[in-house]
Amino acid sequence: MCDTIVATPAYTKNGKMLFAKNSDRSPNEPQFLQHIPAKDYDLQKTPTLALTYVAVPQVEHTFEITISRPSWMWGAEFGFNEFGLNIGNEAVFTKEKYVKTDGVTGMDMLRLALERCRSAKEALDFLTDFIEKYPQGGNCGYGKKFYYHNSFLIADSSDAYVLETAGKYWVWKKVK
């Protein structure tokens, strides 16, 4: 599994939130950093957004983001947006059944939250609502089948949360 860490302002020498993530994806999988400017959409022309496996409703405005993502996937393993919102994704293995087709990957959810949310709390609320409406799933492996549920570490300059998920179930805790 990957590692994502956060040090909250109460525990850093300079009083700043620190966020870091590594990746343990396939060593041959191309992954790159991508900067995507903020954008306005005409919902009459573009009512939906195609994710890796499914489409979801588009919004009128998306925020500027920088993400690290596998080349073949719409979503991202880690990223941040113009408001200083940071999110990292982890694989979670549970007894809950996996949706092997037509699901939303955790990496897709991560990118959606960065594009649509201004704060850690807003991203937490967005992700928990989204998980209840859209099934997690789809192959997340490069060159092989790999299915899992997701955990997210979500942080902005003042708040941090851990969100653990399995299917439509979720639980979160604020990081002190």
Residue map of PLM features:
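Second-shell loop/turn segments in exported
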Residues: 99, 109-116
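A contiguous strand-loop segment
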Residues: 2-106, 126-176
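Short, charged, surface-exposed loops that flank catalytic or proteolytic processing sites
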Residues: 116-124
